[in-house]
């Protein structure tokens, strides 16, 4: 029985804390923080600290991802990607079936120190191509950190449709 009571105490405290948060806020606005409000602030600070720990450690949470734009025009599609610091020998563009693959898979050793630290600047984009893309005439260019891929469009003849009767 004592073990089950220990399990319920944190749950009960959380319920009391959440149900009385408005009451604690009233005194907090006047500059007189209640013990309940102090506990709520402590919990908020700890959650913020945990969020900051992961945000600073995982670049996934940062806005370091490659920015891209897809533009549709009458005669072509245009893909524009920001890839600052890359040169054309580091980026590979391939077409396979109806997929366009844009990749960079190179590890760079950190030259600033003698440790075995590597910087990973890899990326891998797979784009499904529309059926009206002229795959034989896709072109690309890289200038000032901007990768531009031109996907020419061809006219697709509509196949003769046949109506199916419902029995």
UniProtKB/Swiss-Prot annotation:
The keyword Heme does not apply. Residues 59-167 form the sHSP domain. InterPro entries: A-crystallin/Hsp20_dom, HSP20-like_chaperone. It comes from the Bacteria. Pfam families: HSP20 (PF00011). Keywords: Stress response. Belongs to the small heat shock protein (HSP20) family. This is Small heat shock protein C1.
């Amino acid at each position: 029985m004592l073990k089950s009571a220990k399990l319920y105490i944190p749950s009960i405290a959380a319920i009391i804390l959440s149900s009385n948060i408005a009451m604690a806020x009233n005194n907090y606005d006047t500059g007189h923080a209640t013990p309940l409000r102090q506990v709520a602030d402590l919990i908020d600070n700890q959650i913020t600290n945990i969020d900051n720990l992961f945000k600073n450690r995982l670049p996934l949470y940062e806005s370091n991802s490659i920015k891209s734009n897809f533009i549709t025009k009458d005669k072509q599609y245009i893909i524009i990607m920001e890839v600052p610091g890359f040169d054309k020998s580091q980026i590979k563009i391939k077409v396979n079936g109806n997929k366009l693959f844009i990749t960079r898979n190179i590890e760079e050793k950190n030259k600033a120190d003698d440790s075995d630290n590597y910087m990973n600047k890899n990326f891998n984009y797979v784009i499904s191509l529309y059926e009206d893309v002229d795959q034989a005439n896709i072109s690309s260019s890289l200038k000032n950190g901007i990768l531009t891929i031109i996907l020419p469009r061809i006219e697709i003849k509509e196949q003769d449709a046949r109506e199916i009767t419902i029995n």
